[in-house]
UniProtKB/Swiss-Prot annotation:
Keywords: Coiled coil, Disulfide bond, Glycoprotein, Lipid transport, Lipid-binding, Secreted, Transport. It comes from the Eukaryota. SMART domains: VWD. Residues 952-1118 form the VWFD domain. The lineage of its organism: Eukaryota, Metazoa, Ecdysozoa, Arthropoda, Hexapoda. The keyword Glycosyltransferase does not apply. It comes from Galleria mellonella (Greater wax moth). This is Apolipophorin. Its main location: secreted. Hemolymph.
Length: 1515
């Protein structure tokens, strides 16, 4: 409502039976007035049915503050009205209080400044603790003259026509004395005189004196001292006074301080024995440092001496800072009869810490609610995060507190990542904190990967001992470790190592299953001649050892070692003896049977271990059920007792009862607490009873049904495992028989070998083949037997499992238990919809358990539909339950400042409320608008870290339409140099725009060292005022031109600008580091639009003209006047030109859904007003600025077709127009793309520059002079572009037709960018780094993900003219490597070059060039059709059909050849003498010119978008 902001909240709740509570909060805020009304109704409440609270604050004038507080409790109205006037001439304090059963109380203090040294004060106290006072005082205070007159009346204080006259009189000794005269009811109270001494010390006036006064009928000594100080230094201006008066044993001290920052009055009256009465009021504003304002209010009353109690004190402290959250502290205390009551509320958020709490101190206990959240601010990530909430029934007894805490910490580096999470809950009845811990660790260092996780529960003995689970996995090239530990049993512990060397291969494995006996296994190979396999347990060892030395011995032996004694199971050997081959083998059936028996015993033990675990789990679960029931009852009883004690203390406190208002509120609060306890009690009792009954039923079902089934399951699994391994042992025995049979069967052949040893070398191969054939058959039979045995064993195992499963089934008793549990849960559910959902789930589960056939998808669909309905009903139910106890689901009340004293800090309410959480929003039904979420949280960069913090973006169109970083629009037709953006904190950069008659003339960037780079509206660039070609690379600033003609300027400190060639549109992008640190026409960049028009001095201006002119860099420039802006213009009807660009049918319409278009519409209305001739051009320029802003944040956008033309084919073509272009004609475009490697510097100077000159200029000494100028090609353009490995975009150089003016810097070491490594001085680590880096680099190169490739792609976007002959010369540095896209690129290039009539050539170093298999140092260049080489007389000739090969791969050369390009050898050129080089250049230029002029084509072209801003012919 204009400048007034209104907000309201209404909460309705029901509790108990038919009881309701209604709470309505209305708030309104205007610049000088704030209203807050709170209305609460509880019709069924016993003590208080209606409570209305009204708070109104006004600031009718700069020095006047009015506060009205009214409370209506069931028709009993309590009202307080305060008026404070901070005025040097007429200060005023008027506070009145009205209650139903007592007369109105009032404190009235008014001052009148009659002259510079004369003032009058009127004081009225009406019915304050039965005290009334009416007093008027008038004083004249001069250096040598004091007059004080007081008239007062007060029945309570015994004052009747009480008069005081104090005046200075001349003394006999030419001095002055101060005479006192005070009467009460015409009786002498005080009379006499004192000396009078007055002096002036700078700005202090000091008056003091002493003497004897007659008090009633008694003479008493007296002295006084008065000091008056004028405060003029610093920011504080005002007056401070001090008066100390002592008469006999009594004294009176008064202090006063009235300034623009502080108001203070303090009065102390003391009688003998130091019995004092004290009153103090202090309101102070303290500005500790710029941007930090602290406001403190102190009120203290101690009037016990005057018969008024209790002692009362209040202190409120507020602190507001630009860089910190608001700080708030409230302390309220009252003391009576040695009983202390204290309320402390505090909220002290800091960066990284958020402490807050409430403490209530009563005579017998200290209640406290404290919260604290902490996180570090000196790290990249905000971890660890710690939080705690604590409730103290009595803070003096810390052991009785209830607390919940959490800790989350995430740490990481290149080699290690760790996660720690702790969640704890403590209560006195638990005795020990219930703590749930989670630990996770991932290490990756020195070729070792380690994953370690653990979860533990540490809690009350109700759950037995602390429970912990662990999982550890460690892998490296030479080791492996696995650990899985559960609270019941350590499932597996496995550890293995491996050693692989040239003459040694060894593997060790140690494992322990289900906490059984550890087993060690080793496999060893030495010199590929010694083989060993051993298993080692605590009581036995199995060893299998073999030797393989074909020239001496081949053997194998299996032994069992028991108590150090070796027992052979089987052995076999072939060896040479006396030049004869001997054999030896044997087996021990007893030892083998012993081995098999031992294995069977191990299986039996494993079976028993599995059964034992089943028993342990069974027993543990039953113990937990038995202990849970009494503990739940104990906790419930403890909470009930605590609440009851608190209620009784609050309700029965006698001191609180003496204050009618406090007593009413306390009773109301106590009643609410009592109602909540009693309303929740039936629900708690019901839940408790259900838990108890369900626990009993679960225990009963577990004992009778589930436990026997689990026991049977463990026994079944154990027996099946044993049966399976028994089958494996049978297989092993079968293999042993096969092996024995093999040796028996081939014994004659082995004996025959002994007789034929002399022919061993001739027949060895034949024998081996025979043995292998027979071995193959034997192995085949063995494999068949293995497969058959496994199948039979598997089938038997599966059959046994199926039989056991069918036998087990699902007992009816279990189904009945599930039904009872379902009925118990259903009884607890609060709504009919949730009960229907429970029924649907039970129906589905029971059908699955009974193996009934049904449509499962349809049933699940029913469950889902009922779930959604149940969820909605549950949300509504919870909202109702919360509301009935005054717990709102959303707190969205605008803050209303409370007037507490001078120097009030006003603010502009934003009108934006924030819900506490997404859950609250859902409960409230306030689902965020998806479009708003997209606008707020959409990605704005391909690199998410590039937007941390978010960048600042702005646009300037035609120099005068300025769109700030925070989205405001300013039309400023200036005629001077103006600051666009300036880092006023660190002064890292300044952006300046020079305007001439409202049009842009230049854009200037200055770095912190004073270096300036200037973009001019003619496309040129200057450095420190001197002309300079593109690119510009200074220490901290740079400038460039892109192939498409866009100009750029930037700073290494985070400022970047892109402009069109004539500066019509400039897009600015500033790093988010400068949030709130900028000044200039683009705003302060703090994400707050309202303060964008901030002047250099920090003041916020409401005048656009004042704002714009304040950033002139020369005061002599004329002041510009801005056109009037109004809000309705942003949504007004658009002129026709603006409708074409920003209307509903424009291509920019989709962009307006995400990016606010209103400021650009407003700017368009201004731009086309009175400018019909250029209206569309002005509108299109603004459209281009809007598109630039969208593209800068990843939003797709394109200018409307009405704004885009093609002008590169002669004339102006509309988007979509088609036309023909014939070649050749009188134009030629030559594009030279050179790689900026150091190896190309000499090549560029000696070969490329003269070559291009020869192509362009006249060529002599040739029989047929082929060149462009000789063929009357006059319209020649030469483009020079560099590509580099340093960044993925090209460098456009300013150059002439002969490349002689270009300033190319050859700084690259290599053609490709390579991954850097860190030298660790550890040879192994450095080697691993290098290997990984090489792999990454090769992958990047093969995939074409190099900066060189990206630079080439952008370079080929250079706008070559469709009607010109086109030739591309690429200059390679290093040899090109193979990429996956090379064949596709070749095909694409062939199509493109043929369609556009582009010819191309490559200049590259090509060592090892051969023609027809012979070295060819005379070759100038070659194509896929011929080789160009020198003849015997050093004349160039074409050798058709010559086959050119390269001894070193260069895929760029191959690609050029395949696409019908010309490859020129820089290697052969460098080997020539000066005269031969000249012939080389003439021949190469002739070849290039012939290829350019040989094209004769007719192109079909269409005008299309080249980018969102520009049209270009596509032919």
């Amino acid at each position: 409502e204009g400048e007034k902001h209104v907000g309201n909240v209404e909460v309705k709740a029901q509790y108990g039976k038919g009881k309701s509570v209604n709470l309505v909060v209305n708030g309104a805020a205007x610049p000088q007035e704030y209203d807050l009304d709170i209305k609460a109704n509880a019709p069924q409440a016993e003590n208080l049915k209606k409570l209305d609270l009204s708070l109104k604050t006004k600031n009718p004038s700069p020095d006047t503050y009015v506060v009205l507080v009214a409370i209506d409790a069931d028709g009993r109205v309590y009202k307080s009205q305060s008026t404070v006037v901070y005025s040097e001439a007429n200060p005023l304090i008027d506070v009145s209080y009205t209650a139903p059963n007592t007369p109105t109380s009032r404190l009235y203090v008014k001052g009148v400044k009659l002259s510079e040294n004369q003032a009058k004060v009127e004081v009225k106290i009406v019915n304050i603790r039965d005290l009334s006072l009416d007093a008027v005082s008038e004083a004249t205070l001069q250096k040598d003259n004091i007059i004080l007159k007081v008239v007062a009346n007060s029945e309570k204080l015994g004052l009747k026509n009480y008069k005081v006259d104090v005046a200075t009189k001349d003394a006999n000794n030419n001095g002055k004395r101060l005479e006192f005269q005070a009467t009460n009811d015409n009786k002498n109270v005080l009379s006499g005189s004192t000396t009078f001494i007055s002096k002036q010390e700078n700005k202090k006036t000091i008056i003091e004196g002493s003497g004897t006064l007659k008090v009633k009928e008694e003479q008493k000594s007296a002295n006084f001292k008065y000091i008056r100080t004028i405060l003029t230094e610093g920011n504080e201006q005002g007056v401070e006074t001090f008066l100390n008066l002592a008469v006999g044993e009594s004294s009176y001290v008064a202090e006063s301080r009235i300034t623009n920052l502080e108001y203070k009055n303090s009065y102390v009256y003391c009688e003998e024995k130091k019995q004092c009465a004290h009153v103090e009021l202090n309101s102070k504003v303290n500005i500790q440092k710029p941007g930090v304002v602290q406001h403190t209010v102190n009120v203290n009353f101690d009037l016990v001496k005057l018969g008024i109690s209790p002692e009362f004190g209040l202190q409120i402290t507020n602190e507001i800072s630009e860089k910190k959250l608001p700080q708030y502290t409230l302390d309220l205390h009252a003391i009576k009869n040695d009983k202390k009551y204290h309320l402390n509320i505090y909220s002290h958020p800091e960066l990284g810490k958020f402490p807050a709490g409430i403490t209530v101190t009563l005579p017998h206990r200290v209640l406290a609610l404290e919260t604290r959240v902490e996180y570090p601010t000196n790290k990249g990530l905000p971890f660890p995060i710690k939080g705690e909430i604590t409730i103290h029934p009595d803070k003096r007894k810390a052991q009785y507190k209830t607390a919940a805490r959490f800790l989350v910490d995430v740490t990481g580096s290149d080699k290690q990542h760790a996660l720690i999470a702790d969640f704890g809950f403590s209560h006195p009845k638990l005795g020990k904190e219930a703590l749930f811990k989670v630990r996770g660790n991932l290490k990756n260092s020195d070729n070792i990967i380690e994953i370690a996780t653990s979860a533990s529960v540490s809690c009350h003995p109700i759950f037995g001992a602390d429970r912990e689970s662990k999982f550890v996995l460690q892998v490296s090239p030479s080791s492996f470790k696995l650990l899985l530990d559960t609270p019941i049993v350590k499932v597996i512990e496995l550890e293995g190592t491996a050693v692989v060397k040239e003459n040694l291969q060894q593997g060790d494995l140690k494992f322990c299953l289900l906490q059984g006996k550890p087993v060690a296994v080793r496999a060893l190979i030495k010199d590929y001649q010694y083989y060993e396999f051993t298993t080692d347990e605590s009581d036995r060892k199995l060893s299998v050892i073999g030797h393989l030395d074909p020239e001496k011995r081949v053997d194998i032996s299996a032994d069992l070692v028991l108590s150090g004694e070796k027992k052979n199971i089987a052995h076999g050997a072939l060896f040479l003896k006396d030049n004869l081959v001997k054999s030896e083998y044997g087996a021990s059936k007893d030892n083998f049977d012993y081995f098999v028996t031992a294995l069977k015993n191990d299986l039996t033990n494993l079976e028993a271990r599995v059964k034992q675990l089943g028993e342990e789990i069974n027993s543990d679960f039953k113990d937990i059920l038995k202990r849970a029931q009494p503990k739940i009852q104990e906790l419930e009883k403890a909470y009930k007792e605590d609440l009851e004690k608190i209620y009784q203390e609050v309700a029965n406190d006698e001191t609180l009862k003496n204050s009618q208002v406090i007593n009413e509120v306390a009773q109301f609060l106590a009643k609410i607490i009592d109602d909540i306890v009693h309303a929740f009690k039936p629900l708690v009792d019901k839940v408790y009873n259900v838990i108890v009954e369900t626990t009993k039923k679960i225990e009963e079902i577990y004992e009778k049904e589930i436990a026997p089934q689990i026991k049977s399951l463990y026994e079944t699994v154990a027996s099946i495992v044993k049966e399976f391994f028994d089958g494996l042992l049978d297989i092993v025995a079968h293999y042993a028989a096969l092996i024995t049979d093999f040796y028996e069967k081939h014994k004659p052949e082995l004996e025959e070998l002994t007789n034929t040893i002399t022919e061993i070398f001739k027949d060895l191969t034949r024998i081996i083949v025979i043995q292998l054939k027979e071995l193959k058959a034997t192995v085949g039979q063995a494999l068949e037997a293995i497969i058959t045995t496994i199948k039979e064993t598997q089938n038997s195992v599966v059959t046994a499992l199926q039989a056991k499963y069918e036998e087990l089934g699902v007992p009816e008793s279990v189904l009945n238990a599930i039904l009872e549990a379902h009925n118990a849960i259903r009884a607890l559910l609060p709504t009919e919809e949730t009960k229907n959902f429970a029924d649907a789930v039970y129906t589905y589960v029971s059908k699955k358990l009974r193996s009934e056939k049904f449509d499962e998808q349809a049933q699940l669909r029913v469950v889902y539909e009922k779930f959604t309905v149940a969820l909605q009903s549950l949300i509504q139910f919870l909202r109702g339950q919360f509301n009935q106890f005054g717990i709102p689901s959303l707190f969205n009340i605008e803050s209303i400042p409370f007037i507490t004293g001078p120097g009030q800090l006003s603010y502009t309410p934003t009108g934006v409320g924030a819900s506490l959480s997404l859950v609250n929003q859902i409960l409230r039904g306030d689902i965020p608008d998806p479009l708003s979420l997209i606008q707020a949280y959409r990605p704005r960069s391909l690199d998410p870290f590039d937007e941390i913090p978010a960048k600042l973006r702005g646009v300037v169109v035609n120099g005068q339409h300025i769109f700030t970083f925070d989205g405001r629009h300013l039309t400023f037709p200036g005629n001077c140099r103006y600051v666009l953006a300036h880092d006023y904190v660190d002064r890292n950069f300044t952006l300046v725009l020079q305007l001439q008659n409202g049009k842009p003339k230049s854009l200037i960037l200055e770095d912190k060292s004073g270096t300036t780079v200037e973009l001019k509206n003619n496309g040129q660039v200057a450095v420190n005022g001197a002309s300079h070609g593109y690119p510009v690379e200074e220490k901290d600033v740079y400038a460039f031109r892109r192939p498409d003609g866009v100009l750029g300027i930037g700073s290494q400190y985070g400022a970047l600008a892109y402009c069109s060639a004539k500066l019509e549109v400039c897009y600015f992008e500033i790093n988010g580091f400068y949030l709130g640190k900028l000044r200039g026409l683009l705003g302060d960049g703090n994400n707050e639009a309202y303060d964008d028009f901030r002047l250099p001095n920090g003041k916020i201006s409401t005048s656009e003209s004042e704002f714009g002119n304040s950033y002139r860099l020369a005061s002599s420039c004329p002041q510009a006047k801005c056109p009037e802006h109004s809000h309705h213009q942003q949504h007004a009807a658009l002129p026709p030109a603006c409708e074409q660009v920003f209307g509903g049918t424009s291509t920019l319409r989709p962009l307006s859904l995400v990016l606010d278009v209103a400021p650009f519409r407003q700017a368009c209305i201004h731009a086309v007003a009175g400018n019909a001739e250029n209206a569309l051009r002005e509108a299109c320029s603004l459209g281009a600025g809007y598109v630039a802003l969208g593209l800068g944040t990843l939003l797709p956008a394109v200018l409307p077709p009405a704004c885009v033309r093609c002008t590169d084919a002669g004339g102006s073509k509309n988007i979509g127009d088609t036309y023909e272009v014939k070649l050749p004609n009188k134009q030629a475009d030559i594009l030279v793309v050179i790689e900026t490697t150091k190896s190309n510097e000499k090549k560029d100077k000696d070969l490329v520059v003269p070559l291009v000159s020869q192509v362009v200029d006249t060529t002599r000494n040739l029989v047929v002079p082929w060149n462009l100028k000789s063929k009357h090609i006059a319209g020649i353009k030469v483009y020079l572009i560099g590509v580099t490995s340093r960044f993925p975009y090209p460098i456009v150089y300013d150059t002439d037709l002969k490349l002689k003016s270009a300033k190319v810097a050859f700084n690259d070491e290599h053609r490709y960018q390579y991954t850097p490594t860190i030298k660790t001085n550890c040879e192994k680590a450095d080697s691993i780094q290098k290997t990984i880096a090489n792999v990454i680099d090769e992958i990047r190169i093969v995939l074409g993900l190099s900066n060189i490739n990206a630079g080439y792609l952008s370079a080929f976007e250079t706008p070559l003219r469709p009607g010109a002959l086109k030739h591309v010369i690429t200059v390679n540095g290093d040899a090109c490597k193979l990429e996956i896209g090379t064949p596709l690129q070749a095909i694409s290039n062939i199509i493109t070059y043929n369609q556009l009539g582009i010819t191309h050539s490559l200049v590259a170093s090509i060592p090892g060039l051969e023609v027809d298999g012979k070295s060819a140092p005379n070759v100038i260049g070659y194509t896929n059709d011929y080789a160009l080489e020198f003849d015997g007389k050093k004349h160039a000739k074409e050798v058709q059909g010559a086959k050119v090969t390269l001894t070193e791969d260069n895929y760029c050369a191959e690609l050029t050849e395949v696409t019908d390009g010309l490859v020129l050898s820089a290697t052969n050129y460098n080997a020539l003498g000066a005269g031969e080089r000249k012939q080389f250049l003439l021949a190469a230029a002739n070849a290039i010119t012939q290829r350019i002029l040989q094209e004769s084509i007719v192109e079909e072209c269409v005008c299309n978008y080249a980018n969102p801003f520009v049209g270009r012919s596509a032919c």
